Amino acid sequence: FIDLRDMYGVLQVVIRKPELLKGITKEMCLSITGLMEHRDEETYNPKIPSGTIELEAHKIDVLGRVYKQLPFEIQTSKEIREDVRLKYRYLDLRNAKVKDNIVFRSKVISYLRQKMTDMGFLEIQTPILCASSPEGARDYIVPSRKFKGKFYALPQAPQQYKQLLMASGFDKYFQIAPCFRDEDARADRSPGEFYQLD
């Protein structure tokens, strides 16, 4: 057996011809052709949505090969040092718990966007490169290519643009805004960058 995983879950693959597994190692990207079958009732796996079916492999094509030993096991990536996880982020994102966090965040943002729109708010994006403004943290600055010695600041919050919109008559505005603050890490946000519903 092998477990075939994609964005949507895991499927058990039955290998009846051992030669199909020649050269196959963990975390390779595979294309498997075969026959989908119902599992015998005593082999059902209620822990996964595909637990009543399995794929009998007739052909396996390797789409992406693994040439080196993996730096960590995918299912335990959350226990690994953060610098290692970030270096191999493409592997860390294969961990179901990490993926589920990203999917959850996407659903929350979609929900907020729909709710605000339903209440008559207009979604407006404000500029990212702007003048520095007096906020609570230090600015991240971006040098101007055109104006030597001049700098843009990344917004700590879209406050000034929100006030411009309100003064212009946009009374129901929202955005899911990136905010950039050159400050130390906090328990509730990443150092330097976070998103907020404004």
Language-model features: locations:
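Class II aminoacyl-tRNA synthetase catalytic cores and aaRS-like
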Residues: 1-198
